Amino acid sequence: MNTIHYNETVQLQPCVATIGFFDGVHRGHQFLIRHLVETASQENLQSTIITFDEHPRKVLQSDYQPEMLSTLDSKLLLLSKTEVDNAVVLHFDKAMAAMSACEFMQKILHDHLHVRKLFIGYDHRFGHNRSETFGDYVRYGKELGIEVIKNDAFRIDDINISSSVIRSFLKEGEIELSLIHISEPTRPY
C-alpha cells in the first residue's frame, strides 16, 4: 500500500475511493474496504482510502478529546494489511472544514485524486457543517464524472458497527464484545 500525505501537487491514477476517519479499522470499515477493493479490481482502477490526520471533531470543537481506537500510525498499519493500493492522508484543519462538499469533491477528489467512483459509508457526511446529503453528493458527482455509491451498514446482532459503538462497549467494560466488532478472527485486518 502506498501512503500519501496529501498536498496540492499530489496526482493519483484514476481510482475507486472511500473517505472517512477509519478509527480502529473495525469490521464495518473492513466490509466497506472489501467492496472498494472488489469494485476497483473489476473496473481495473486503483483502490484508495482517504482519511485524516486529525479527528474532524477535534479540530472543530477544541474542547473535544475523543478516545481514539487507533493512532494514525496504527490505522495506517492496519490499512496496509488490506489489499488497498493507496491510503491518502489529508491534513484536516479549519480551511478544509470550511470547504463545501462540492468544493471538496472538485478540488481534492476530482482534480488531484482522480476519483471515478466514491463509496460512502451509510452514515458518512462531509463538507462544511456536514450540511449536505447523499443526494447532494450524487448530484455533484454527476457533474464531475464521479459515481457516488452508498455502502450499507455492517451489522452484528442487529447493531450497526461503528467506532462510536465500539468505544461505548469499551467504556462499559465489554472487552469481548468490542473485540468481536473490531476484527474478524479469520482475517489479519
Named regions from a protein language model:
Residues 180-189:
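Single conserved hydrophobic/aromatic residue that forms the stacking wall/gate
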Residues 8-71:
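N-terminal catalytic cores of NTP/NDP-binding nucleotidyl/phosphoryl-transfer enzymes
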Residues 143-154, 161:
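A short, charged helix-loop
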Residues 161-166, 174:
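Extended, well-folded interaction surfaces typified by the phenylalanyl-tRNA synthetase beta subunit core
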Residues 2-8:
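Short acidic-hydrophobic, aromatic-tinged amphipathic segments that line or gate anion-handling sites
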Residues 58-144:
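N-terminal Rossmann-like or analogous alpha/beta NTP/dinucleotide-binding catalytic cores
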